[in-house]
């Protein structure tokens, strides 16, 4: 319980600190060229590990990737059976909601403006947690993979 509260508070403070730095737009923050990755420490109960990878070129966001990988290195966004099952059950699937989350972030320039995607509530929270970590590293130039405690 203590761990959950600690993680929640850390996320809230990090979100506040990062969004405070960005003001209204991402591009108001000085970003260091490089590729920055944040990923969860553990695979989830379904065998996936979420990650975000941000690439900065000439001080600007060039690319943002949000996906999940299994122990064999397969991407969730490319798993056809997972897509079919999820789309039938909740009306969305990883490649679709990943793109939506990334576009919301890039268009608004603010993590706090990213809305929950229906059918992908957990993934939305995971995206927000991981993008905060990746963007913080992009401001400091730390290109080491940021390992983040899974949200429980």
Annotated model-derived regions:
Residues 1-4:
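Positively charged n-region of N-terminal signal peptides that target proteins for export
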Residues 16-20:
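C-terminal motif of bacterial Sec signal peptides marking the signal peptidase cleavage site
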Residues 11-15:
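Alpha-helical transmembrane segments
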Residues 26-152:
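Active-site- and interface-proximal helix/loop "cap" or "latch" segments in soluble metabolic
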Residues 22-24:
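Bacterial signal peptide processing site
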